[in-house]
Amino acid sequence: ERFDVSSKVGYVFKDMPYQSIGFQNAFNSHNQKSYFGLNQYNIKQSSFYSNLIFNSIISNTMHKFATGLNFTYDKYQEFVNVNDYSRIDNSVGAFFEYTYDNDSNFSLVAGGRVDNHNRLGTFITPRLHIRYNPWEKGVLRVSAGRGKRSANIFAENQPLFASARTFEILDTNGKIYGLDPEIAWNYGLSFNQKFTIFERSA
């Protein structure tokens, strides 16, 4: 059983097509009752998401930025056999992203966000993307960023309920399911060169 509803409104400022403001909202409800042999898994989730974003430029269109606020709310009524893992999660966040593009051979996107979560506290997630064309048909890309999330360990691994395995959570000092959140630092570097062999692109 699932229900979804969403809304999106925006406004582009008169005589300033590069400047706009948008407001997004979404609500969904999901109710699932499952039996895997002798294992029973029931979950009812209600989620709300709201996002306010403002886009504009700095001096000229080579320098753009986006900033805003968002709010998320998740209520879980989750039962694994006789164990109750129900909880309520909510967070408030603010973000800022700057984009530079010289419309020729270089672009940069740098941003970050600050979130305050009722269980995970306050944390920062930055990110950076760079694209450079040193010569014709050659592209160098560099990226880096940080991510943090709390996994829904049962909902994301439901096929395991069909096995004969038992479930034990060994750590109990974390904030969600007794576990700490997943934290990942991601880095990327690539170079792509297009050329022609025997009049064919390669």
Put a short name on every predicted segment.
Residues 1-4, 8, 133, 137-139, ...:
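Outer-membrane beta-barrel signature, preferentially recognizing the C-terminal barrel domain
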